[in-house]
């Protein structure tokens, strides 16, 4: 499947906000967005007023880039969220947060979602004791995610744990770093996902046109 492989900092600059795609680096003075907080390109510093369509498009692009999802798959998620009963925004965030690569990141076994996706692709994680190498695999409540025994000495995983072990874990996830495992306790509510910088209603409206 095609995947964006260009500079991650350009994505933050294009959306006009930090998306924290590089993990620890985004919190340091090396962050490119802090140094150049405007869109990339020759005319990046020009301010343009967005139309309603433009606002919806930027919101949709921001969510896709945060979770590292391509258009076709993201559109399927939105359709699925619309078909389910209840609040479409909450349905959508629960789908996004249940992705295995996202949960690996939330548990602190990777410094960002991109790294989590690579680690899952390379087969370093078990779900309920079975190897799963599909980043988009959707977890269910009480599913247990575990670093494979032979992968526990990987420097990249050790560094991620060291960087994240003092940080608070989101309430819908439980982590046991000593045993390299965590549990996806439940789906989060919309209000609990506080690090998403856009209004999902704007995203839903884009696909409802």
Curated annotation (Swiss-Prot):
Q: What is this protein called?
A: Small ribosomal subunit protein uS4
Species in which this protein is naturally found: Thermotoga maritima (strain ATCC 43589 / DSM 3109 / JCM 10099 / NBRC 100826 / MSB8)
List each copy of the S4 RNA-binding domain by range. 98-161
Q: Which PROSITE patterns match?
A: S4
- Which stretches of the protein fold into C4-type zinc fingers, per the record? 9-31
Write out the function statement from the record. Answer: One of the primary rRNA binding proteins, it binds directly to 16S rRNA where it nucleates assembly of the body of the 30S subunit.
As cofactor, the record names: Zn(2+)
Task: List the record's Gene Ontology CC terms alphabetically.
Answer: small ribosomal subunit
């Amino acid at each position: 499947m095609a995947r964006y492989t260009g500079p991650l900092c350009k994505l933050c600059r294009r959306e006009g906000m930090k998306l924290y795609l590089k993990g620890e680096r985004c919190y340091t003075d090396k962050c490119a967005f802090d140094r150049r907080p405007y869109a990339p390109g020759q005319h990046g510093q020009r301010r343009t007023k967005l139309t309603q369509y433009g606002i919806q498009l930027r919101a949709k692009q921001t969510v896709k880039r945060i979770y590292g999802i391509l258009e076709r798959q993201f559109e399927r998620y939105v359709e699925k969220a619309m078909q389910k009963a209840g609040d479409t925004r909450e349905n959508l965030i629960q789908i996004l947060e249940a992705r295995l690569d996202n949960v690996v990141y939330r548990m602190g076994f990777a410094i960002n979602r991109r790294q989590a996706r690579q680690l899952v692709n390379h087969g370093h994680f078990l779900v309920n004791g079975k190897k799963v190498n599909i980043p988009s695999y959707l977890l269910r409540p009480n599913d247990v995610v575990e670093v494979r025994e032979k992968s526990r000495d990987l420097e990249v995983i050790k560094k991620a744990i060291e960087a994240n072990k003092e940080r608070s874990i989101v309430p819908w996830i439980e982590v046991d770093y000593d045993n390299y495992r965590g549990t996806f306790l439940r789906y989060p509510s919309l209000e609990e996902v506080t690090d998403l910088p856009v209004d999902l209603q704007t995203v839903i409206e884009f696909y409802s046109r």
